[in-house]
Amino acid sequence: GKYSVIKSLGEGAFGHVYAVSDWSVNNYALKLLRLWDVPSDIRQPLIDRFDMEFKTGRITSKNLVHSYDYGFIEGNPYIVMEYCSGGDLSRLMGDSRTDVARLASDILGGLNDLHKNGKVHRDLKPENVLLQSDGTAVLTDFGISGDRNKRMTERNIFGKPYQIFGTYA
C-alpha cells in the first residue's frame, strides 16, 4: 500500500494506532478501526464517528493533531495523521522540570480552536494530549468529539457514572 508500518503505538477498544512511513520517508501515525471486532449493529455509527474524527483533524491549528489521509484497508477505515514523537502527556506527570504554563497554554489553544470550529473534545485526558518533538502539546483522539451547537442528550454522554456525577459509586 501507500504506507509501511514501523511499529505499534497503542490500541483502544476498536482500533489500533501504528507509526508508519510513506515512500518519501515521512513519518505519520495511522489509526485503523478494526471492524472485525465490532458487532454489526454498531459498525456504521463507529464509521460515522471515525469520519467525524478525520474531519475534526482537518481543522487548521498548531495545537490539534492534523489528519492527512483517510481510506480503507480490507473494508476497515483508517486515518493517517501527524506523528508526535514526544509521546503523550502522561509521561511528563510528576516531572518537576515540566513547563506547566506552556502545556496549559497549548492545551487551551487546542480547545479554543475546536470551539471556534463548533466542536467540543469530550475526552480530554493525559493520553489524548501528545507532544511534538519541540515539546508543543497537541490534542488528539476526536472520536467522541461533538458539535457544541447541538443540545446535549443522554445519548451523547460518555463516561462512568462516578466520572459524570463526581462520586465513586
Model-identified regions with their sequence ranges:
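AlphaC helix of the eukaryotic protein kinase fold
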Residues: P39-R58
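Activation-segment/catalytic-loop signature of the eukaryotic protein kinase fold
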Residues: Y70
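Conserved short submotifs of the Hanks-type protein kinase catalytic core
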Residues: E74-D88
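Activation segment signature within eukaryotic-like protein kinase domains
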Residues: L103-A104
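Protein kinase catalytic-loop region centered on the HRD/HxD motif
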Residues: G109-K119
